[in-house]
Curated annotation (Swiss-Prot):
Disulfide bonds: none annotated. This is Nucleoside triphosphate/diphosphate phosphatase. Keywords: Hydrolase, Magnesium, Metal-binding. Belongs to the Ntdp family. Has nucleoside phosphatase activity towards nucleoside triphosphates and nucleoside diphosphates. It catalyses: a ribonucleoside 5'-triphosphate + H2O = a ribonucleoside 5'-diphosphate + phosphate + H(+); a ribonucleoside 5'-diphosphate + H2O = a ribonucleoside 5'-phosphate + phosphate + H(+). It comes from Streptococcus uberis (strain ATCC BAA-854 / 0140J). Its cofactor is Mg(2+). One of its GO terms (molecular function) is ribonucleoside triphosphate phosphatase activity. It is an enzyme of class 3 (hydrolase).
């Protein structure tokens, strides 16, 4: 499949391990694609939950997906600074319909003051049994939590202030064309 290019809009779909659709984001603007990564932005993007509820994102958010890492990163740009929501998830695939990944419940939230929290551990444990997550997936996810925490600690990639400034500036340039 041809990679989307800068300024294109794509749909993002997250699934659960059992194959059920979890959440959809419509009209994510692509800022950059490479063979292994996609950087985009959601700004007042329509989100549809699996139960049909809909809502619109409140602030601009730089989104980062990679084909090697078992997480994706949402950097929410707010008046009081940047906060992050990181999903432990399968590497993404891109087809003619959408960018797709499997959401594995565990999340890491990074507040604008730098505080980190691992979220939804109970939900992960319930779904691990209910959906029969294989032990190798459990291991991979736990190892990727460590990678993610290291990225946060060392301000790597999306956790770098310069990264956010560069991609937010590029978004504003594309938006105002």
């Amino acid at each position: 499949m041809k990679l989307p290019k800068e300024g294109d809009f794509i749909t993002i779909q997250s699934y659960k391990h059992d194959g059920s659709l979890h959440r959809t984001w419509r009209d994510t603007m692509v800022l950059k694609t490479t063979e292994n990564a996609l950087i985009g932005v959601n700004d007042h993007t329509l989100v549809t939950e699996n139960d049909g509820r809909r809502w619109v994102t409140r602030e601009p958010a730089i989104v980062y997906f990679h084909k090697k890492y078992w997480f994706n990163i949402i950097a929410m740009i707010r008046d009081n600074g940047v906060s992050y929501y990181c999903n432990l998830a399968s590497p993404y695939v891109l087809d003619g319909e959408a960018l797709k990944y499997i959401d594995y419940d565990l999340d890491v939230k990074v507040f604008s003051d730098g505080e980190k929290r691992l979220l939804d551990v109970d939900e992960y444990e319930v779904h691990k049994v209910k959906m029969a997550y294989p032990s190798d997936i459990d291991y991979i996810l736990k190892e990727n939590v460590k990678v993610l925490v290291d990225w946060i600690k060392h301000k790597k990639g999306p956790f770098s202030e310069a990264y956010i400034k560069i991609w937010y500036k590029r978004y504003l340039e594309l938006k105002n064309r």
